[in-house]
Swiss-Prot record:
Classification of source organism: Bacteria, Bacillati, Bacillota, Clostridia, Peptostreptococcales
Keywords: ATP-binding, Cytoplasm, Magnesium, Metal-binding, Nucleotide-binding, One-carbon metabolism, Potassium, Transferase
Cofactor: record remark: Binds 2 divalent ions per subunit.
GO biological process per UniProt: one-carbon metabolic process; S-adenosylmethionine biosynthetic process
Name under which the protein is recorded: S-adenosylmethionine synthase
InterPro entries to which the protein is assigned, alphabetical: ADOMET_SYNTHASE_CS, S-AdoMet_synt_C, S-AdoMet_synt_central, S-AdoMet_synt_N, S-AdoMet_synthetase, S-AdoMet_synthetase_sfam
EC number: 2.5.1.6
Length: 395
């Protein structure tokens, strides 16, 4: 078998783009708590001393957006000006409008309903936009995710944990991780390279940071059997990372879509998740596609599975569904597609119902990945249809 390297990255909750994702989803959660049927498209931008929240929100409730923004930033850890951002003193600007009436026409009543072709009430709601969404699963890890992104997320989360619990007191919120895994054919065999860039106080030297990162972060997360004497470590390779967060780089909602999904291991339709309610198929259909792919792999129908869904704005049924098993399928892809059509309802209203997507809780996935989260009970991560699929496939 041939050897190859694959690399994925993650970022901590203090990364400027991830700050924006969390703020947008915290606002979404607060609105859904009071008005589950609200339409939300909330975008956030941050720069030095400034937060701008803009978008389209149609709701019957009131939420205090500046208060939510400040609380989210405080929980992330930007509480002092010397960290590069202060939740108490930053400016918060809002520019919120209602959802376009033209878009609402298609979401409120789907094309099938307008033509009198709808079979049930689930076809009364149309997709909130056109677009393509991908879902993926593979058997490289227990959570059925690619190993590079799984390790990158866990390292990033560990960076945050050791900062917040005081294990490494000089750390600050901003940070990034990157993991390169060596494959023998399609099997991951070792970790080739680990990159960690972490914001820190000015008082600490590079040697101390490297020692602490390897001892308290890498060795606590990466299985020892994946590390060897040839594994390379790049810890803060610029030599200094004191200026970070929005002071170092401006941030924007939806700019970490590969981090949010599969780390580049699978395709991506281009749509971001955070700040969007579930009528936006960018989010809900991507979650549904992961749910389908994960159940297919959990059922043993394939070692790898990628699902593509496509929608037209204002139309409830998917325009197309594609199954790709990369030669690992135990049954034909056409047969898998038939099972999907039989056991998964991929109309937006059905996805929202089956996955409980009107419930708040989106901020929990706004950092460290929307998929493969063993630390959270996510409906789209359940494998409750795997046994049924296995039986019907005759495996």
């Amino acid at each position: 078998m041939f050897k190859k390297l694959f690399t994925s990255e993650s970022v901590t909750e203090g990364h400027p783009d991830k700050m924006c994702d969390q703020i947008s989803d915290a606002i979404l959660d607060a609105i859904l708590e009071k008005d589950p049927a609200a339409r939300v498209a909330c975008e956030t931008s941050v720069s030095t001393g400034l937060v701008l929240v803009a978008g389209e929100i149609t709701t019957k409730c009131y939420v205090d957006i500046p208060k939510i923004v400040r609380k989210t930033i405080e929980e992330i850890g930007y509480t002092r000006a010397k960290y590069g951002f202060d939740s108490d003193t930053c400016a918060v600007l809002t520019a919120i409008n209602e959802q376009s009436a033209d878009i609402a026409l298609g979401v409120d009543e789907a094309l099938e309903s307008k033509k009198g072709e709808h079979r049930d009430e689930l076809e009364a709601i149309g997709a909130g936009d056109q677009g393509i969404m991908f879902g993926f699963a593979c058997n490289e890890t227990p959570e059925l995710m690619p190993l590079p992104i799984s390790l990158a997320h866990k390292l990033a989360k560990r960076l945050s944990d050791v900062r917040k619990d005081g294990t490494i007191g000089y750390l600050r919120p901003d940070g990034k991780t990157q993991v390169t895994v060596e494959y023998d054919g399609d099997k991951p065999v070792r970790v080739d390279t680990i990159v960690i860039s972490t914001q820190h106080g000015p008082e600490v030297d590079a040697a101390t940071i490297e020692k602490d990162m390897i001892e308290h972060v890498v060795q606590k997360i990466v299985p020892a059997e994946l590390l060897d004497e040839n594994t390379r470590y790049f810890i803060n390779p610029t030599g200094r990372f004191v200026i970070g967060g929005p002071q170092g780089d401006a941030g924007l909602t939806g700019r970490k879509i590969i981090v949010d999904t599969y780390g580049g291991y699978a395709r991506h339709g281009g749509g971001a998740f955070s700040g969007k309610d579930a009528t936006k198929v960018d989010r809900s259909a991507a979650y549904a596609a992961r749910y389908v792919a994960k159940n297919i792999v959990a059922a043993g129908l394939a070692d790898k599975c990628e699902i593509e869904l496509a929608y037209a704005i204002g139309v409830s049924r998917p325009i197309s569904i594609l199954v790709e098993t990369f030669g690992t399928g135990k049954i034909a892809e056409a047969d898998i597609a038939e099972l999907i059509g039989k056991h998964f309802d991929l109309r937006p209203a059905a996805i929202i119902r089956d996955l409980g997507l009107r419930n708040p809780g989106y901020r929990n996935v706004a950092a460290y990945g929307h998929f493969g989260r063993a630390d959270l009970d996510l409906t789209w991560e359940r494998t409750d249809k795997a046994e049924l699929l296995r039986k019907e496939a005759g495996l």
